[in-house]
Amino acid sequence: MMEEGRKEEPEERGEKSTMRDLLQRAVDKGHLTAREALDRWTLEDHGEIHPWIILFCFAGAIGVIGGWGLRGELNVCMLIVLVVLVPIYWGIGEAARNIDSLDWKWIRKVFIVIIFVLVGLLGGCSAQRQHVAMLLSPPGIRLPSTVDIPWFCISNAPIPDCVHWTVQKPDQKHQQIENVMELQEVLDNATFFEVPDLFDRVYLELARLDANSTGVPVNIPPTGISQVKGDCSTGDIQGMNETLSTRGTLGERTFLSIRPGGWFTNTTVWFCVHWPFGFIQRKENLSEGSAQVRNCLDPINVTEPRVANYSYCPLEYKGKNYINKGLKCVGGRVDLSSNPEQHTDLLACGTFCQNFRNCDMVSRDILIGYHPSQQKQHIYINHTFWEQANTQWILVQVPNYGFVPVPDTERPWKGGKPRGKRAVGMVIFLLVLAIMAMTASVTAAATLVKQHATAQVVGRLSTNLTYITKIQNQYLHLFQNLNTRVNNLHHRVTYLEFLAEVHEVQTGLGCVPRGRYCHFDWRPEEVGLNMTLWNSTTWQQWMSYYDQIEENIWNLKYNWSEALEKGKSNTDGLEPDVFRYLADLSSSFTWGSWVDKLVWLAYILLAYFAFKVLQCIMSNLGAQTRYQLLNAQEDTDPAGDGDQPDDHRSGDTPRSGVPSGGWSQKLSEGKKIGCLILRTEWQNWRNDLRTLRWLTLGGKILQLPLSLLVLLVRILLHILSPTFQNQRGWTVGRKGTGGDDRELSPELEYLSWTGSSQEMVEMRDLKEEDIPEEGIRPVEM
């Protein structure tokens, strides 16, 4: 193959040199003009690529790469465009080799228009902005920053599953929280963490639900001392959660320490709630008789009511801090065995521990302040409040949806197949049928047993009554179990109703009730979303903040709809034209649209050529009016000697400006040239197919439409070139009747006289020495 390629190169060079010699010989002999020889050489594919073509190719490639950079992603469509541009640019480059400088007058205009369109499109691309998105189901809170939120757990179950909290040590829990925080820092674009789905409407029933269905709260074991620091008002309460265990008849249960930032955990239903209460005053800021407890949701004022059972443990006394001393509560009092040197100080202020039912607790877990001026009057918590805290589990409402800023390039998450509706009504109906069937069966069994006992001896009546009592007990136990299951079903249905309300709100805002985000067209500052307030607001304030943002979005949508209706009423009747224009604009980069543009371009070219033809015809008609035929009297010799010029015959008037004879010959020559060019191109195609030159053949296939257009332009220019010169006042004709019929080159063309016949006779009779040096000046049109 290499040898064949080397052989082909000299052959091609020889063909080029032979073609050049033949054209030069034809020009020397006068068979071809210089213009025709140049056209023949150009049509033989020996041209070069024009710089405008190279600039256009580079502009298109830079536009594609620039669009890629603005979007920030490389999709399949962009790859297809890059791959398709290579053969297109190749074909344009190959077609440019056959275009001379005269044909670039209209091609340059097309390129300039295309470049302006590309510049306008690139200039219209806006920078990336942010818009507001609503977090959709599953309900939860997104961690927008690395703030230490005091509670969260990761779960995928419909009911929160916090099992991993019960089997880990405190250090492991904190390590897990840190790992999640680090993961959140790595991710971006609204990373979503699912938190416990705390029910909004179920307050007491689900929290107190237990295996024995008695509703009696489980006693809390001793908690010891927790190291607590921070302030609940800013959400910075931190500390070590202590895992505690107790065994009883109901199985093993695990609880976290009761303190600000701690948790209650009931392993029966695996339900996590937050204990948010704690004193927020410090020793320096306390005033006598006033103290405030805050739960990070709502402040609670605590006074000094009369109580029967209370005690305290100071956080700080006489400038000494006892927080990190490891004190324990033994027998209702503080164990001072580990700190004997401070025994006196603690006894001076009272070393009692809070009596919480039958379980002792160190009150330091609740952050009790101490007033230094009056040692006998201490700040304590209302006993009724303690009973309420022990009886009812306190639930923290978790926002089921929120608003976050996301970039404009973020695409909505396309969810999978939606989950089917649960047949809750069918389950309830089946339960009712089961209850009725079981009731009927139990009643029938009791009746049969009673009839059988009556038919038997009277002595077995007591045994039958015993059997009936057992059946009634079993029936009662069955209804207790059914009650428990119906309660569970009630909680699930209540939660689904709440989710339905949330989805209704989301649907009203134009959101799909599934997926990850619901994208809006407004920026965060337009709806009033400020994520910097996260660390300085409580949960209740944050929920009201969400309500305000939701109201702002409703107002924006309402204003937008009103503006749309107003604009629609103002532009009534113009919508179809606007939509049609937008549709045409959106389809401006499709192949079909460019074909339409080429058709219009062909129409414009045909109109231009028709205009030129009419202009040439008018010019020829104007030139024809300047001719005057000589009659018999004017043909005679002015001197009366009867001699006539030898080279002037009665039928040979210089009427070469008339287009009838010249145009037919031009048309035949143009037809011959076109056939010659097409025959040459077909021979080249056959050679490429025979030698399997697929690269050259592919370029020629791509440049075929443009080559045909260029061929048409060349034929028209060849036909109309004499007419263009007629517009300047000259008429192109033949050298004479006695000479050959070939057309001379443009440098040696014979110029016909456009004056009167009398002037022509006078000029003919002049001798060569009488002709002025500057020659005969033609008459300007």
Curated annotation (Swiss-Prot):
* Entry-linked InterPro entries: GP41-like
Q: Which residues lie on this side of the membrane: Extracellular?
A: 1-597
Ranges facing Cytoplasmic side? 619-781
Q: Which GO terms describe its cellular component?
A: host cell plasma membrane; membrane; viral envelope; virion membrane
Sites marked Cleavage: R422, A423
Annotated region described as Immunosuppression, given as residue ranges: 482-498
Q: Which residues are glycosylated?
A: N189, N212, N241, N266, N285, N301, N309, N382, N464, N530, N535, N559
GO molecular function annotations of the record: structural molecule activity
Q: In what ranges is there compositional bias, type Acidic residues?
A: 634-644
GO terms classed as biological process: symbiont entry into host cell; virion attachment to host cell
Regions crossing the membrane: 598-618
Where do the segments described as Disordered lie?
634-666
Q: How is it modified after translation?
A: Specific enzymatic cleavages in vivo yield mature proteins. Envelope glycoproteins are synthesized as an inactive precursor that is N-glycosylated and processed likely by host cell furin or by a furin-like protease in the Golgi to yield the mature SU and TM proteins. The cleavage site between SU and TM requires the minimal sequence [KR]-X-[KR]-R.
A Pfam family of this chain: BIV_Env
Where are the residues of the annotated region Fusion peptide?
423-443
What keywords are annotated for this sequence in UniProt? Cleavage on pair of basic residues, Coiled coil, Disulfide bond, Glycoprotein, Host cell membrane, Host membrane, Host-virus interaction, Membrane, Transmembrane, Transmembrane helix, Viral attachment to host cell, Viral envelope protein, Virion, Virus entry into host cell
Q: What does this protein do?
A: The surface protein (SU) attaches the virus to the host cell by binding to its receptor. This interaction triggers the refolding of the transmembrane protein (TM) and is thought to activate its fusogenic potential by unmasking its fusion peptide. Fusion occurs at the host cell plasma membrane. The transmembrane protein (TM) acts as a class I viral fusion protein. Under the current model, the protein has at least 3 conformational states: pre-fusion native state, pre-hairpin intermediate state, and post-fusion hairpin state. During viral and target cell membrane fusion, the coiled coil regions (heptad repeats) assume a trimer-of-hairpins structure, positioning the fusion peptide in close proximity to the C-terminal region of the ectodomain. The formation of this structure appears to drive apposition and subsequent fusion of viral and target cell membranes.
Q: How does it assemble?
A: The mature envelope protein (Env) consists of a trimer of SU-TM heterodimers attached by non-covalent interactions or by a labile interchain disulfide bond.
Protein name as it appears in the record:
Envelope glycoprotein
Question: What is the native source organism of this protein?
Answer: Jembrana disease virus (JDV)
